[in-house]
Every structure is written in structure tokens, then in C-alpha cells.
Regions:
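Glycine-rich phosphate-binding loops of nucleotide-dependent enzymes
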Residues: 2-256
Length: 256
């Protein structure tokens, strides 16, 4: 069976700088896969290529067996990609609930006419979107805060709201870019429980993360990047005992 996501020998150059060299990875349906490595290893560049923000210098990317290399970001998102970023991107002066509803806009079918005259079709879609948004806020434990401004939420809850916004796209693959960055221990544990819920729902996740405890607890497989190359891949147990990984990254991560 073909992988849900397949990255085949991707190289990315910026002028004379090579950010990625022959990177290959795959993610199967329902898996949680991690990408780790030192700062500057090329992790976010890889995510940017997968989601269409960058074009690879060479290599190919497939989703469900269909090539998506060089498709624009909005077309890739429409195929079922949801993504969070290192820097939180929310509508600060909108409510938590409205932040999720806005994220659903690209999936609605109502026309401008429907919206202006509030036709039965528009009312039906509004009702469906509201029900889905409320479901997602319960999933990420933000139901009680649904009418609060996004900017009023503590950092950890803003991260969870960003995940809810990504999930609003009815995605086939969720990409999380350092979801636990900047969180305290309690916030990280709460996030871990939410990701476990997503796993139980058969959500497929590819994530970048520096918190090794988080990665080892939630990922089924891990790829390790160093200087733009995959130097190892395997289960958490295999990665934690790989001497090349320890030398390149894990020893540094433990010191931080």
C-alpha cells in the first residue's frame, strides 16, 4: 500500500547554499512521525517544500500516490494539508470560536449571493460549520474559552487553538512545526494528551520538535536531519541508541 505522504530525494538550494540534500521520507495513514535535528538542519525548509511555500531544486513529493511537487500552497491545502507554524498565527482580536470558523471558509460551497441573502444553503453551511468548530474546541479543551479573544489566551492554549484551526480543514495530514516550543511542563503534557486523542482518531501527523521527551513519547518513527541530510530513521528506541544521532544532536539536546 502506498504511503499517505512520500518525499522522494528532495534537494533544496538557495543560491550557493544547499539546505536539503536527497531527503527521503514517508508517512503512512494514522502514523505520527517526527523530524528532529539541530537548528539549521533543514527541518522547516522541508515543511515549506511539502506545503508548497518553496519549490524543491530537485526531487518529488506525493500525497496518496498523486504528485504534488510545485503545486501552489492553496491547492496543496485543499488536498487535505493542515499546518501550524513556529510562530503562532491567530486573529488576535477575534474570539476563539471565530478563529476556528474563519479557518473553515475555504471549505464552504456557498456563493456570495448565498451569503448576502442568507439562503437556506448558507444557513445550512453555517450550522454545520458551527457544530464542527464547537466539536474541535472540545477536542482541544478550549470550549470554556470559546468567546474569549484569542490574544487573551495563555501561550499553551494559543498553541492548541492553532491546532484546532488546522484541523478545521478536514485534513488528511497534519504538520506540526515545533508545537511544544516555549511551553512549560504542564502545557506540554496537556498538548501531549491532545495529540494522543488525535492518534486515537487515526489522524496522520508529521511533526518537528526539539522536546525529546515529547517526541519519544508520541512518535512511532523518527527521522533525524543534520546539515540537510537524513542521517538516521527508525523507532524512538532505535534513534535514542544510534551513536551518530547522539553525536550530532541528542547530546546537544540534553544539554539545552
Amino acid at each position: 500500500m502506498a504511503s499517505l505522504l512520500s518525499v522522494e530525494n528532495v534537494t533544496k538550494q538557495f543560491g550557493g547554499l544547499t539546505a536539503l540534500t536527497d531527503v527521503a521520507l514517508h508517512v503512512d495513514q494514522g502514523e505520527i512521525v517526527g523530524v528532529i535535528g539541530p537548528n539549521g538542519a533543514g527541518k522547516t525548509t522541508l515543511f515549506n517544500i511539502i506545503t508548497g511555500l518553496y519549490s524543491p531544486t530537485k526531487g518529488r513529493i506525493f500525497l496518496n500516490g498523486k504528485e504534488i511537487t510545485n503545486l501552489p500552497p492553496h491547492k496543496i491545502a485543499a488536498l487535505g494539508f493542515g499546518r501550524t507554524f513556529q510562530n503562532i498565527r491567530l486573529f488576535a482580536k477575534m474570539s476563539v470560536l471565530d478563529n476556528v470558523l474563519v479557518a473553515m471558509h475555504s471549505k464552504t460551497k456557498s456563493s456570495l449571493f448565498d451569503a448576502i441573502f442568507h439562503t437556506p444553503r448558507a444557513r445550512r453551511e453555517d450550522k454545520q460549520c458551527l457544530a464542527r468548530a464547537e466539536e474541535l474546541l472540545r477536542l482541544v479543551d478550549l470550549w470554556e474559552e470559546r468567546y474569549e479573544y484569542a490574544s487573551s489566551l495563555p501561550y499553551g492554549k494559543q498553541r492548541r487553538l492553532e491546532i484546532a484551526r488546522a484541523l478545521a480543514l478536514d485534513l488528511s495530514l497534519l504538520l506540526l512545526d515545533e508545537p511544544a516550543a516555549g511551553m512549560n511542563e504542564q502545557e506540554t503534557q496537556e498538548l501531549l494528551e491532545i495529540v494522543r486523542k488525535l492518534k486515537q482518531m487515526n489522524t496522520t501527523i508529521l511533526l518537528i520538535e526539539h522536546d525529546m521527551k515529547f517526541v519519544m513519547n508520541i512518535c512511532e518513527r523518527i527521522y533525524v536531519l543534520d546539515y540537510g541530510r537524513v542521517i538516521a530513521d527508525g523507532t524512538p528506541k532505535e534513534i535514542s541508541s544510534n551513536q551518530a544521532v547522539i553525536d550530532a544532536y541528542l547530546g546537544l539536546a540534553e544539554d539545552e
